[in-house]
Amino acid sequence: DNYINATDIGLLLNLCIPTTGEVTNNVINVSGDGDAASCLEINDYPIPSLWNVENNYITVNDARYGILNRAGHQNAFMNNTIMVDPYTEDDAFGIYLDGTKSPLVTCNDLTGDIEPLESNFHMSSGIYFEGANNFDITCNEVTDFRYGIRVSSQNTGEGLLRGNTFGDLWQGLFLGSTSIIGPQDHHGNIWDGTYYDFAAVHEGVTNSIIQKSRFLIDSGDNLLFDPSSISAAYNWFTDESGISFTCDEEEICPEGIGHYSQLVAWDSLDLDVIAGNLGFEYFD
């Protein structure tokens, strides 16, 4: 419940003792310069740290990172709204995960530059992750970045990329030449925008590396499960019948996508006013 305006780092959590800490209901705005400027930076030990980062409204002005998390295990990033604009740095990131194990990234709303033809989005990414074993990136909405979701290196384990909506982007989903996210079977990601290059890109040059991140989709359930344009050396998306994941049915985001307004808790006086129990009957 803080309003934070900063020129370098809005909130820094640096090698804190592992706990179940929370960063919730904050408004954070960083107008800094340089490659290290971030709104929220969490540098963890490589052990379970269990941070819950939820319902924050984050604005990245002349900075690089909305949320930056290095190392740590089992951190959750939920229902955050992140605005990244403008891009004065060469690159900018909504959420950046570096070696974070078992991260949960759900129900976030990420919006970048709105002048793609002029800026080419620079090298911005809505969500970037590498070395994020057993990740769960589900039901996020990304728009107006160069890369909607960008993946680097190997992300082993049971990775889940589900129910994400790729809006207007230069490239929707981007995997580097050695990137691995595991098989994604009927996970219901939606390509619902204009893509100035490709909706989905895999830079791998061998079929074996591409198949370690292959997608099964059922376009009969929803035509938007099938990216409108794909760049890959081998078949990456296969259309076959199956039961598709949807965010609504799974009730992943009961508060909707992004930052939400909280109901004010009633105190005892509020409850008395509502009930009409103020004792006025004892006075003329």
Question: What residue ranges belong to the model's regions?
Answer:
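A detector of tandem-repeat and repeat-rich interaction/domain scaffolds
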Residues: 139, 158-163, 184
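Short, intrinsically disordered, charge-balanced linker/junction segments flanking boundaries
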Residues: 1-4, 42, 52, 126, ...
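Extracellular/surface-exposed low-complexity segments
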Residues: 208-284
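Polybasic, proline/glycine-rich intrinsically disordered low-complexity segments
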Residues: 175-230
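Extracellular beta-strand/beta-solenoid scaffold signature
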Residues: 5-16, 30-48, 60-70, 81-100, ...
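Repeated loop/turn-to-beta-strand initiation elements of outer-membrane beta-barrel proteins
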Residues: 19, 75-76, 103-104, 134-136
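Extracellular distal adhesion/interaction modules in secreted or cell-surface proteins
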Residues: 6-14, 18, 36-39, 48-50, ...
